[in-house]
Swiss-Prot record:
Induction: Repressed by abscisic acid (ABA). GO terms for biological process: defense response; methylation; rRNA processing. Expressed in roots and flowers. Expressed in leaves and stems. Expression levels decrease during aging. The N-terminal DMA/Gly-rich region (also called GAR domain) is rich in Gly and Arg and functions in nucleolar targeting. The central (138-179) and C-terminal (225-281) part of the protein exhibit cooperative RNA-binding activities. It comes from Arabidopsis thaliana (Mouse-ear cress). S-adenosyl-L-methionine-dependent methyltransferase that has the ability to methylate both RNAs and proteins. Involved in pre-rRNA processing. Utilizes the methyl donor S-adenosyl-L-methionine to catalyze the site-specific 2'-hydroxyl methylation of ribose moieties in pre-ribosomal RNA. Site specificity is provided by a guide RNA that base pairs with the substrate. Methylation occurs at a characteristic distance from the sequence involved in base pairing with the guide RNA. The gene is FIB2. Residues 1-79 are annotated as: Disordered. This is rRNA 2'-O-methyltransferase fibrillarin 2. NCBIfam families: PRK04266.1-2. Disulfide bonds: none annotated. InterPro entries: Fibrillarin, SAM-dependent_MTases_sf.
């Protein structure tokens, strides 16, 4: 067990041990668990090394407010107000700190140890929300970056390429709700295990452990979808998206792609890479509509959103 951090300047507070270490010269020292713990050494985390606190931090974890033990809730306790975001299915929890949240499809269950917030409704029932961390999810970073439309909304059918262990997929599953469906494709078996375990509890997630470069291999599992979200971080990711779109994305559907400049070409500036990728997408019947940077959450990443095989707009008759 990793010793929890104390907030008072010097070192770590130990677990439940007897004495712990008192710091040497450079280490702000560990302060002991239930008893001892000397003073932290000279140049630790704070200038003076600080004094080790006897008993470790309060039970609610290092920072959590008044939430359940171990994983504190939002700061501000019962004063959290949840408001709908302009993207349907996304909410903002306003407490001491504002956070992006989604309504938990499986109340009582966390997927990746994220914070959960329970809000009392007027009729006495409770609704549980899960905090959506933009540092762990490109889609949340794009929403906070001000993307105009993510096209993923309640009832939508989504094909998610590069699902990893299902962190973002779980929030997309919350977003589309019981009427929607998320086909989550992931090639790595290790991440796939977590993905499959998450999907056991979320009936609207269909995990597919397969290479997104070969959509023909899973064509029997996936129906036509409204949106493809792609986060594959491969040099040929535009091609991977186009292949999957040709099989599964309906005409007039939409795509959201997260582009990591470094994994395409690390020798040129990120902006140039994004420009080239957008051109590639345009050649494949995609119509990119907007691009947002994922700074400060991800470095040299951009998110591009647009339509696929969009119907031609009828030309308005010119007035004589």
């Amino acid at each position: 067990m990793r010793p929890p951090l104390t907030g008072s300047g010097g070192g770590f507070s130990g677990g439940r041990g007897r004495g712990g270490y008192s710091g040497g010269r450079g280490d702000g020292g560990f302060s002991g668990g239930r008893g001892g713990g000397g003073r932290g050494g000279g140049r630790g985390f704070s200038d003076r090394g600080g004094r080790g606190r006897g008993r470790g931090p309060p039970r609610g974890g290092a920072r959590g407010g008044r939430g359940p033990a171990g994983r504190g809730g939002m700061k501000g306790g019962s004063k959290v107000i949840v408001e709908p975001h302009r993207h349907a299915g996304v909410f903002i929890a306003k407490g001491k700190e504002d956070a992006l949240v989604t309504k938990n499809l499986v109340p009582g269950e966390a997927v990746y140890n994220e914070k959960r917030i329970s809000v009392q409704n007027e009729d006495g029932t409770k609704t549980e929300y899960r905090v959506w961390n933009p540092f762990r999810s490109k889609l949340a970073a794009a929403i906070l970056g001000g993307v105009d439309n993510i096209w993923i909304k309640p009832g939508a059918k989504v094909l998610y390429l590069g699902a990893a262990s299902g962190t973002t997929v779980s929030h997309v599953s919350d977003l589309v709700g019981p009427e929607g469906c998320v086909y989550a494709v992931e090639f790595s078996h290790r991440s796939g295990r977590d993905l499959v375990n998450m999907a056991k509890k979320r009936t609207n997630v269909i995990p597919i452990i397969e290479d997104a470069r070969h959509p023909a291999k899973y064509r029997m599992l996936v129906g036509m979808v409204d949106v493809i979200f792609s986060d594959v971080a491969q040099p040929d990711q535009a091609r991977i998206l186009a292949l999957n779109a040709s099989y599964f994305l309906k005409s007039g559907g939409h795509f959201v792609i997260s582009i990591k400049a470094n994994c395409i070409d690390s020798t040129v500036p990120a902006e140039a890479v994004f420009q080239t990728e957008v051109k590639k997408l345009q050649q494949e019947q995609f119509k990119p509509a907007e691009q947002v940077t994922l700074e400060p959450f991800e470095r040299d990443h951009a998110c591009v959103v647009g339509g696929y095989r969009m119907p031609k707009k009828p030309k308005a008759a010119t007035a004589a």
